[in-house]
Amino acid sequence: MGVDGELKKKKCIIAGVITALLVLMVVAVGITTSRNTSHSEKIVPVQIKTATTAVEAVCAPTDYKETCVNSLMKASPDSTQPLDLIKLGFNVTIRSIEDSIKKASVELTAKAANDKDTKGALELCEKLMNDATDDLKKCLDNFDGFSIPQIEDFVEDLRVWLSGSIAYQQTCMDTFEETNSKLSQDMQKIFKTSRELTSNGLAMITNISNLLGEFNVTGVTGDLGKYARKLLSAEDGIPSWVGPNTRRLMATKGGVKANVVVAHDGSGQYKTINEALNAVPKANQKPFVIYIKQGVYNEKVDVTKKMTHVTFIGDGPTKTKITGSLNYYIGKVKTYLTATVAINGDNFTAKNIGFENTAGPEGHQAVALRVSADLAVFYNCQIDGYQDTLYVHSHRQFFRDCTVSGTVDFIFGDGIVVLQNCNIVVRKPMKSQSCMITAQGRSDKRESTGLVLQNCHITGEPAYIPVKSINKAYLGRPWKEFSRTIIMGTTIDDVIDPAGWLPWNGDFALNTLYYAEYENNGPGSNQAQRVKWPGIKKLSPKQALRFTPARFLRGNLWIPPNRVPYMGNFQ
């Protein structure tokens, strides 16, 4: 059998196993119901006889069961197979978001017509909600045609995209909170069902993930694991599944050949980065390398969703610099739009480049780099700003040997992110400000998102040291209810307040957050006086392993081809 035939066979096996597990879930629900009904009755596994029974079973793990059941039944399912019902749920959610976008446009456009700030929020919201549906469509497109021959990776991909959809929708709501408009509540109501449906979809997929662990599926289908290991082996050290174009790029010794060159002095094809980006082929599926020569490039750069597999290579993080000064407080720009550089196209890589926002602490929210792309890698980059410097908005991201500097919430967002061997630099804030390194934005307890600092160095710039006892610095604070941040193997200088973490507002999220420090060192790592919130965790070595790049990002599958230093686990 050829490779294509083998892959099809594997896919059929995987689909069959997932369906079988979901049927087991339905049976379990039926058994539980039977047990609760009568202890004297003989327990008999129930059959899926009606659409109602099947829908109720699939909706069992969700938080919004009534919304789940009503939406699926209204869609008149023609199948009682659990997998088909979950796919139907994705379609229903997409239609719900699209209908809500239209409703918001009809009902709120007139109300926002005389308010530039609110009108801008409404326009941005429409874009974000369309991005949310794109992630849901990714789930549908990959449901039958997934290519990674491991069930766990397939399920995790779905969780990543569902988490991304949730992040986009939450960002829409956050955008309205930045205005003084009363329309924020209207937006919450209009998109209430859509957001509940997305959460329900994540709950269903997460339940599959849990079942895989409980039933030890990788052990049952061990040939899949063996097949995956085969895919990752090759004599030249490059995974065998990497395509010929990428292989040639990776195998090149003495540097990478650029597709285009950007230079201020006219020695390249283009003088601006945005001009070079316009040369990226449509539906690009192979590395497109843009070499950006030494210089300061004052431009707002947007790598759009259509610009995939783009690589930026500079002459050094302090030699090639992209700069801007858009900000929320002085410039009246929405936080999401303040980014000097916005990365939206998947499979993006940046090496040896600096990104900065020069608005200063007076500008308040002023993003230097926003990353919404999936499978993004940054190596030897410098990201400088003050408040909200690095916006790790959504999806999988890996930073290695980078420097990030700032004051308030300067690494924030809801991506699945690992910063490895990075320097985290606290800067001097305004007189009345404290400094918080992280503000992770996980808003649903099942999201696969979180922020991990591994083998990093947390320090302060020289100007901060004299004011550290006045303008105290903290490891982070919970931006959203299920905020998750893990700091491990990191050297923490004497710049962090002994309490370690700071509340966001009163007791918000203190019970539901997930914060952990594991095997850190340095004078700021002493946990004796740390806050004692219920959400603070003490990790075992096994638990800590979950947050290494190999596990948390499934990084072994996609980071090594970028040829950057990479440590999958602890060594």
UniProtKB/Swiss-Prot annotation:
It catalyses: [(1->4)-alpha-D-galacturonosyl methyl ester](n) + n H2O = [(1->4)-alpha-D-galacturonosyl](n) + n methanol + n H(+). Disulfide bonds join C402-C422. Residues 49-204 are annotated as: Pectinesterase inhibitor 58. Residues 1-28 form the signal peptide. Its EC number is 3.1.1.11. Coiled coil: none annotated. GO terms for molecular function: enzyme inhibitor activity; pectinesterase activity. CDD domains: PMEI-like_3. Pathway: Glycan metabolism; pectin degradation; 2-dehydro-3-deoxy-D-gluconate from pectin: step 1/5. It is found in: Secreted, Cell wall. GO terms for biological process: cell wall modification; mucilage metabolic process involved in seed coat development; mucilage pectin biosynthetic process; pectin catabolic process. One of its GO terms (cellular component) is extracellular region. The record marks Q387 as: Transition state stabilizer. Glycans are attached at N36, N91, N207, N216, N347. Expressed in siliques, but not in flower buds. Residues 259-556 are annotated as: Pectinesterase 58. Keywords: Aspartyl esterase, Cell wall, Cell wall biogenesis/degradation, Disulfide bond, Glycoprotein, Hydrolase, Secreted, Signal. It comes from the Eukaryota. The PMEI region may act as an autoinhibitory domain and prevent untimely PME activity during transport. Acts in the modification of cell walls via demethylesterification of cell wall pectin. In the N-terminal section; belongs to the PMEI family. This is Probable pectinesterase/pectinesterase inhibitor 58. The gene is PME58.
